[in-house]
């Protein structure tokens, strides 16, 4: 509503999930360059995905306006999970190799690669379950279909009674 008032025309918001954010980025890149299409793109489709596959867009496909937000990522588990710390999760994974899984917003997304790095550092075997987007991965962890999920603090605060953060992937501790 506020954007409509400022711009003097209707604003339609379309959430386009899929392929780690590249579906939405492709749609924005292919839109007419008439100033009527804006994209709020996460970091993955702009930095990670171009290094993993050939995409129908590149850095020059967009006119960049601003950085809207920057937030840390959290390693989330269900509130009723048997582990209360990352160390306990690692110990559980080592005792049950290949039994733990994790969701992400897509192959090559920041959450996917974050868990790959964590698993490699801890020398544990976990199974990746890619989702269409973060909302789908959140539904999977809330439903007990995945063991863990890396996401931003918004999901944690909105579902604090159902999920728990084991640690923050950021240079500083969160308040």
Predicted segments, located by residue:
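Hinge/capping helix and adjacent helix->loop/strand transition within the periplasmic-binding protein
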Residues: 3-5, 30-36, 43, 50-136, ...
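Short helices/loops that flank or line small-molecule/ion binding pockets
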Residues: 23-33, 116-121, 135-145, 154-162
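Early extracytoplasmic/lumenal segment of secretory-pathway proteins
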Residues: 10-26
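Paired acidic/hydrophobic, glycine-rich loop segments that form the ligand-binding mouth/hinge
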Residues: 35-41, 147-151, 165-167
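Structural signature of the Rossmann-like NAD(P)-dependent dehydrogenase/reductase core
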Residues: 15, 40, 104, 164-169
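Signal peptide-proximal N-terminal region
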Residues: 1-12
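Short, intrinsically disordered, charge-balanced linker/junction segments flanking boundaries
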Residues: 156, 171-175
């Amino acid at each position: 509503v506020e954007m409509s008032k400022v711009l003097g025309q209707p604003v339609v918001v379309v959430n386009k999930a899929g392929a780690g954010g590249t579906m939405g980025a492709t749609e924005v890149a292919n839109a007419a360059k008439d100033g009527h299409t804006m994209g709020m793109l996460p970091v993955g489709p702009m930095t990670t995905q171009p290094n993993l596959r050939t995409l129908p867009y590149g850095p020059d496909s967009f006119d960049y306006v601003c950085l809207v937000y920057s937030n840390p990522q959290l390693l989330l588990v269900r509130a009723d999970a048997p582990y209360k710390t990352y160390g306990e999760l690692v110990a559980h994974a080592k005792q049950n190799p290949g039994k733990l899984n994790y969701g992400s917003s897509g192959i090559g997304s920041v959450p996917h690669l974050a868990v790959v790095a964590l698993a490699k550092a801890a020398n544990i075997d976990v199974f990746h379950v890619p989702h269409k987007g973060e909302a789908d991965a959140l539904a999977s962890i809330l439903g007990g279909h995945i063991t863990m999920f890396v996401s931003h603090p918004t999901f944690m605060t909105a579902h604090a009674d159902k999920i728990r953060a084991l640690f923050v992937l950021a240079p500083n501790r969160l308040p």
